[in-house]
């Protein structure tokens, strides 16, 4: 576990809110010069705490409209076959996230398709090759993700801001330059506009206008930072909650918003629980304590829950241009 101080935690927090904001602006907020902020960011990158700066955007502008989550549990598996299955998904352009899990599922794959009719052939081809190695498989369609600020990085009293609402299905027109801007920012959300203009053979004025337009249209939802939480002594936990009283769902979300470790909530269709939420926690004991508190606060509402945590991510991207080996 890497040690960081309060200033580093503040820098991470404000990068999570907007990773494209200037170093000077971050410095004013945290009480440091932009040179010191730059040094601290580079240091956290070298330590592996900061993995990369990402751009949140909806999928429709790149011609991909169906966003599907696949869960798998293995059977009759060997390490070599498991590696082969993972590589199979990594090599498919449709897969945007491939990760091995700890908890109720063994493998998660997020895939995107231009229309619903492409889903079955993709799954059919995969099952023809590896279906015998799956004890269970489940699919669900993503619709909305609400992401909240990681207020625990500052202190437990920091209030949650209004969430970034990710509505994954919107009809918005775009052109080749828009798509190339998104591709570049997907690789590095902090890429300077001057560099973007040079690489895309455009001008600073045009690129600046296009980014503002994409944000105004709701294509670009925000700019964040991928943090290796394990380097800081935390882990990511996804919790799937089934309810006895579905009408209490929003009340439960509001209650969870008071928790500084609450990171996001999801709405899905298909094999999905009534409420799916994410936390950044120190350990699984903390997760069980939180769920005990939730059940105590809503004694007639929570039926049961299950969870998973990511063991290793093999691929994470919106555009099929780079893999994690």
Task: Give, region by region, the residue ranges found by the protein language model.
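A compositional/biophysical signature of low hydrophobicity enriched in polar/charged and small residues
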Residues: 1-325
């Amino acid at each position: 576990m890497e040690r960081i101080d309060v200033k580093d935690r503040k820098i991470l927090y404000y990068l999570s809110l907007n990773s494209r904001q200037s170093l000077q602006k971050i410095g004013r907020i945290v009480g440091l010069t932009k040179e010191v902020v730059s040094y601290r960011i580079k240091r956290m990158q070298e330590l592996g705490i900061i993995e990369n700066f990402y751009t949140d955007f909806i999928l429709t502008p790149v011609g991909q409209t169906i966003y599907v989550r696949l869960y798998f549990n293995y059977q009759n598996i060997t390490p070599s076959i498991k590696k082969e299955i993972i590589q199979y998904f990594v090599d498919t352009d449709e897969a945007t996230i491939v990760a091995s899990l700890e908890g109720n599922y063994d493998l998660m794959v997020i895939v995107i398709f231009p229309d619903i009719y492409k889903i079955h052939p993709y799954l059919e081809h995969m099952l023809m090759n590896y279906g015998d190695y799956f004890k269970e498989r489940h699919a669900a369609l993503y619709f909305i993700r609400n992401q909240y600020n990681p207020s625990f990085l500052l202190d437990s009293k920091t209030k949650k801001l209004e969430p970034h609402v990710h509505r994954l299905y919107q009809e918005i027109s775009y052109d080749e330059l828009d798509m190339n801007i998104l591709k570049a920012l997907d690789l590095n959300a902090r890429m300077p506009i001057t560099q973007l203009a040079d690489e895309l053979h455009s001008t600073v004025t045009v690129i600046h206008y296009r980014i503002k337009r994409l944000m105004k249209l709701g294509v670009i939802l925000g700019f964040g930072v991928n943090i290796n939480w394990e380097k800081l002594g935390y882990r990511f936990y996804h919790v799937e909650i089934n309810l006895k009283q579905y009408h209490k769902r929003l009340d439960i979300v509001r209650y969870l918003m008071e928790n500084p470790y609450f990171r996001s909530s999801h709405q899905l269709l298909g094999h999905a629980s009534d409420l799916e939420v994410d936390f950044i926690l120190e350990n699984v004991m903390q997760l069980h304590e939180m769920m005990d508190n939730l059940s105590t606060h809503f004694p007639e509402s929570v039926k049961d829950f299950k969870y998973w945590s990511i063991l290793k991510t093999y691929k994470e991207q919106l555009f099929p241009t780079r893999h994690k080996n």
